[in-house]
Structures are given as C-alpha cells and as structure tokens.
Amino acid sequence: MSGRGKQGGKVRAKAKSRSSRAGLQFPVGRVHRLLRKGNYAERVGAGAPVYLAAVLEYLTAEILELAGNAARDNKKTRIIPRHLQLAIRNDEELNKLLGKVTIAQGGVLPNIQAVLLPKKTESQKAKSK
C-alpha cells in the first residue's frame, strides 16, 4: 500500500455562491453565463460579472425604492407600472438613462402648459392676499 486513498482526506467546504461572496442578491453565475453566450467578447474576466450584477442590483433597488414612494403617495401598497413610470420620469438621472424606454401601462406625467391655465385677474389677486 502506498498510503493513498480515502484515509486522512480533506473535508470539502460547503459550496458558496459567487453572489453570496460578493454580498449580492443578483446571480453572478447567471450574468457570467449570459456574458459568455452573448458573444460580447471572446473572453470574460472573473470580475466583470460581479461588477455588472452589482450595477444591475443597484439600479433595480433605486427604481423600486422610488416606485414604492410613488405607490405610498397614491395610498397603494402594491407597485404597478404607473408607479414605475412616475418614479423614472420624475428622477432626472433615471429619466436620462431610460429616456427612450416605453413602459407598458405606464401612462404619462401630468403636465399642463402655463399658457393654458386661466389667467389671474386683479380681483383674484386681491382675494388671495
């Protein structure tokens, strides 16, 4: 016997996902697979899917937080596409990022041009004071 075999072998540690190692909720492994299958580049580095998953998770959290605020402002407990639309269009940076995106069932932002509003007369100005 050469002493090789199953005796004294190392105990294998429990598998830990790359998402949990990075402290993310989004799937790093899936993002890596999609980057490889998408023919974006011949090779994909180990850090690229972690970074991309982190960016996607941050953007999602930001949009959901603003949409949740919009839902609460409308006295609703469920986020609907209208709340997503209001959240994105009222935020300057998100609106710039998603400017060309159409959200189904999102509606439009309420907006009335100033020239179309009724003009204030002298009697109305006196009443308001």
Swiss-Prot record:
InterPro entries: Histone-fold, Histone_H2A, Histone_H2A/H2B/H3, Histone_H2A_C, Histone_H2A_CS. Keywords: Acetylation, Chromosome, DNA-binding, Isopeptide bond, Methylation, Nucleosome core, Nucleus, Phosphoprotein, Ubl conjugation. The modification Phosphothreonine is found at T121. It is found in: Nucleus; Chromosome. Residues 1-22 are annotated as: Disordered. Pfam families: Histone, Histone_H2A_C. Monoubiquitination of Lys-120 (H2AXK119ub) gives a specific tag for epigenetic transcriptional repression. Following DNA double-strand breaks (DSBs), it is ubiquitinated through 'Lys-63' linkage of ubiquitin moieties. Residues 7-19 have a biased composition (Basic residues). The modification N6-acetyllysine is found at K6, K10. SMART domains: H2A (SM00414). GO terms for cellular component: nucleosome; nucleus. One of its GO terms (molecular function) is protein heterodimerization activity. The modification N5-methylglutamine is found at Q105. The modification N6-lactoyllysine is found at K10. Disulfide bonds: none annotated. The nucleosome is a histone octamer containing two molecules each of H2A, H2B, H3 and H4 assembled in one H3-H4 heterotetramer and two H2A-H2B heterodimers. The octamer wraps approximately 147 bp of DNA. Belongs to the histone H2A family. Core component of nucleosome. Nucleosomes wrap and compact DNA into chromatin, limiting DNA accessibility to the cellular machineries which require DNA as a template. Histones thereby play a central role in transcription regulation, DNA repair, DNA replication and chromosomal stability. DNA accessibility is regulated via a complex set of post-translational modifications of histones, also called histone code, and nucleosome remodeling. This is Histone H2A.J. The lineage of its organism: Eukaryota, Metazoa, Chordata, Craniata, Vertebrata.
